[in-house]
Amino acid sequence: MAEYTLPDLDWDYEALEPHISGQINEIHHTKHHATYVKGVNDALAKLEEARANEDHAAIFLNEKNLAFHLGGHVNHSLWWKNLSPDGGDKPTGELAAAIDDAFGSFDKFRAQFSAAANGLQGSGWAVLGYDTLGSRLLTFQLYDQQANVPLGIIPLLQVDMWEHAFYLQYKNVKADYVKAFWNVVNWADVQKRYTAATSKTQGLIFG
């Protein structure tokens, strides 16, 4: 069975300073993300064993663990691509037009996305996603690593609101972290994801 692996980053840990510190990025990548990778591989191994033993209680437990850790791995893999030392500013082209159509303007989108991030209770993510059935952009709060995700959604942009993503630098002032996040958003990556979502996933659930 193929194992999940920790992806390399496209930039050095210090590259996002002063907006996100090198210390945070290094710990976030080598400790937190690595733990999710180990967790998903462990869950898969235990799930295989439980199935062989027809232990349904263990199957259900490890399916839950798999969902959590795989969610953490996927979310963080997207997170690193969503960030760039050359990021910031605003999107252009088709993505900019889609944001204007869905939210009224980029400033209104930014305010709504930031409110989703700052208003999150507990741990999770704020997400901009593409609804493959309604052919529209949506923002929503993702709880923990896998909960409250609308079906048929392709994530395009996410901000990590777990405390490990910001506390060493911003303490409990989440709003300052979210404000800093906009300075390193890799809009080229978000545009690439939007193009793929709109061209390859029509009616995702129904085929």
Swiss-Prot record:
The UniProt annotation places Mn(2+) binding at H28, H76, D160, H164
A Pfam family matched in the record: Sod_Fe_C
Which InterPro entries does this entry report, sorted A to Z?
A: Fe/Mn_Superoxide_Dismutase, Mn/Fe_SOD, Mn/Fe_SOD_BS, Mn/Fe_SOD_C, Mn/Fe_SOD_N, Mn/Fe_SOD_N_sf, SOD_C_sf
Q: What class of enzyme is it?
A: oxidoreductase
Tell me the keywords, alphabetical order. Manganese, Metal-binding, Oxidoreductase
Give me the reactions it catalyses: 2 superoxide + 2 H(+) = H2O2 + O2
Q: What is its EC number?
A: 1.15.1.1
| An example Gene Ontology molecular-function term | superoxide dismutase activity
Query: What detail does the entry give on cofactor binding?
Result: Binds 1 Mn(2+) ion per subunit.
What cofactor does this chain's UniProt record say it requires? Mn(2+)
Q: Which PANTHER family match?
A: SUPEROXIDE DISMUTASE 2 (PTHR11404), SUPEROXIDE DISMUTASE [MN], MITOCHONDRIAL (PTHR11404:SF6)
What's its job? Destroys superoxide anion radicals which are normally produced within the cells and which are toxic to biological systems.
Family classification: Belongs to the iron/manganese superoxide dismutase family.
What is the protein's given name? Answer: Superoxide dismutase [Mn]
Species annotation: Mycobacterium lepraemurium
Q: What's the name of its gene?
A: sodA
